[in-house]
Amino acid sequence: MVLVQDLLHPTAASEARKHKLKTLVQGPRSYFLDVKCPGCLNITTVFSHAQTAVTCESCSTILCTPTGGKAKLSEGTSFRRK
């Protein structure tokens, strides 16, 4: 049984399980997305944790709906992480 932990060089698996502020290097887990509308192929920038429903500017279709955490993308939309 090993009782020694290397605090300067943690494993990637242990860092992924920690809270975002308790990791060795703090950082946000949110990001921006380029979402393409399935109807008009217009690209809109959306925040990953959007708190309001985002609609397409030209055809007014709903691109994503808010949930408790991350926003849920609508069916047929394609996205790219920025």
UniProtKB/Swiss-Prot annotation:
Subcellular location: Cytoplasm
Protein keywords: Cytoplasm, Metal-binding, Methylation, Ribonucleoprotein, Ribosomal protein, Zinc, Zinc-finger
Modification(s) after translation: The N-terminus is not modified.
Organism of provenance: Saccharomyces cerevisiae (strain ATCC 204508 / S288c)
This protein's name: Small ribosomal subunit protein eS27A
Gene that this polypeptide is encoded by: RPS27A
Note: Present with 43300 molecules/cell in log phase SD medium.
Classification via PANTHER family: 40S RIBOSOMAL PROTEIN S27
GO molecular function: RNA binding; structural constituent of ribosome; zinc ion binding
Main subcellular location of this protein, as a coarse class: cytoplasm
